[in-house]
């Protein structure tokens, strides 16, 4: 009888130990669960009816989501969250001032993702690119023409975390990385190269029909485009930082010259919206090696 009671006691103890082990495992599992997504900061519409979304709101939402993934690939989770928050703050402030520009960034990003070898997708991307760059050029002009003092401008830049210091709020390198992703050399360079290759024949066939002054402008435009292509083609993976910086400054200077010469012929570059400048000032462009500059004949 005593042996039976002892056996029951041992069995009960084993059951308790098994139960405690299972509970501990469940606790560990609960701790390992990912934290729930933070609640959306978007204000819900009130009972009076749906709220009208301002221009660019949809573009902001999609852009924030895509950039959060971009930051997470660059940093660990804590830094990614911080970078995302800084980027979102800067873009929200930009969207309040220039909602159309934010919307164009999203259109450009979507078009870049769809661009392929077919003419339709390339024309769509080119159109979005031109509109976005036009907005950037307008913003730069407005800033130059504004009456802000140097001190006010410095404070504004610090508020966006884009000052030149090395503080934690400096988001300028991140914004530059975003621009490089949106305006990749693999997408932009082939289109520019194609125009330069078609330009000589176009100039030859329109020599007699164009006013001399306009013809000379087109000749100069072709020459500048070829110089830009040569800069792209001179890039190598072993270039030093000094060489890359010098090439970048040269490209920006050439792009400004290109803008001053006006629009390229629509037969070569496609239709352009009225009043739109062929402005590529703010881009950090570099071209892939391999394409020969010999086809760019300076006329």
UniProtKB/Swiss-Prot annotation:
It is a lipid-anchor. The modification N-acetylalanine is found at residue 2. Belongs to the peroxin-19 family. It comes from the Eukaryota. Interacts with a broad range of peroxisomal membrane proteins, including PEX3, PEX10, PEX11A, PEX11B, PEX12, PEX13, PEX14 and PEX16, PXMP2/PMP22, PXMP4/PMP24, SLC25A17/PMP34, ABCD1/ALDP, ABCD2/ALDRP, and ABCD3/PMP70. Also interacts with the tumor suppressor CDKN2A/p19ARF. The modification Phosphothreonine is found at residue 236. Changing residue 296 to S: Abolishes farnesylation. Abolishes PEX19 function on peroxisome biogenesis. Does not affect binding to ABCD1, ABCD2 and ABCD3. It comes from Homo sapiens (Human). Residues 297-299 form a propeptide. A lipid is attached at residue 296 (S-farnesyl cysteine). GO terms for cellular component: brush border membrane; cytoplasm; cytosol; membrane; nucleoplasm; nucleus; peroxisomal membrane; peroxisome. Changing residue 296 to A: Slightly inhibits PEX19 function on peroxisome biogenesis. Ubiquitously expressed. Isoform 1 is strongly predominant in all tissues except in utero where isoform 2 is the main form. Residues 2-56 are annotated as: Docking to the peroxisome membrane and binding to PEX3. Necessary for early peroxisomal biogenesis. Acts both as a cytosolic chaperone and as an import receptor for peroxisomal membrane proteins (PMPs). Binds and stabilizes newly synthesized PMPs in the cytoplasm by interacting with their hydrophobic membrane-spanning domains, and targets them to the peroxisome membrane by binding to the integral membrane protein PEX3. Excludes CDKN2A from the nucleus and prevents its interaction with MDM2, which results in active degradation of TP53. Coiled coil: none annotated. The modification Cysteine methyl ester is found at residue 296. Pfam families: Pex19. The modification Phosphoserine is found at residues 35, 54, 66. It is found in: Cytoplasm; Peroxisome membrane. Residues 1-63 are annotated as: Disordered. Residues 2-91 are annotated as: Necessary for PEX19 function on peroxisome biogenesis. The keyword Acetylation applies. This is Peroxisomal biogenesis factor 19. Residues 16-27 have a biased composition (Acidic residues). One of its GO terms (molecular function) is peroxisome membrane class-1 targeting sequence binding.
């Amino acid at each position: 009888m005593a042996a039976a009671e002892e056996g029951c006691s041992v069995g009960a103890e084993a059951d308790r130990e098994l139960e405690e082990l299972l509970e501990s495992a469940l606790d560990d599992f609960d701790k390992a669960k990912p934290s729930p997504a933070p609640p959306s900061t978007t204000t819900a519409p009130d009972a009076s009816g749906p709220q009208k979304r301002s221009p660019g709101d949809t573009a902001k939402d999609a852009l924030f989501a895509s950039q959060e993934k971009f930051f997470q690939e660059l940093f660990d989770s804590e830094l990614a969250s911080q970078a995302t928050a800084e980027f979102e703050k800067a873009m929200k402030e930009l969207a309040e001032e220039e909602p159309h520009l934010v919307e164009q960034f999203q259109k450009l990003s979507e078009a870049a993702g769809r661009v392929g070898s077919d003419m339709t997708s390339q024309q769509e991307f080119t159109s979005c690119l031109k509109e976005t760059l036009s907005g950037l050029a307008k913003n730069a002009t407005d800033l130059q023409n504004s009456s802000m003092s140097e001190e006010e401008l410095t404070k504004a830049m610090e508020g966006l975390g884009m000052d030149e210091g090395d503080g934690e709020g400096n988001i300028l390198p991140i914004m530059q990385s975003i621009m490089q992703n949106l305006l990749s050399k693999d997408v932009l360079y082939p289109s520019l190269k194609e125009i330069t290759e078609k330009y000589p024949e176009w100039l030859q066939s329109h020599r007699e029909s164009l006013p001399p002054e306009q013809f000379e402008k087109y000749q100069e435009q072709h020459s500048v485009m070829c110089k830009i292509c040569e800069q792209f083609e001179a890039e190598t993976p072993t270039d030093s930082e000094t060489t890359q910086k010098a090439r970048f400054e040269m490209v920006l200077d050439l792009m400004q010259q290109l803008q001053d010469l006006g629009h390229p012929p629509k037969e070569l570059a496609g239709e352009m919206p009225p009043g739109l400048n062929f402005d590529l000032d703010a881009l950090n462009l570099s071209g892939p090696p391999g394409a020969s500059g010999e086809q760019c004949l300076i006329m």
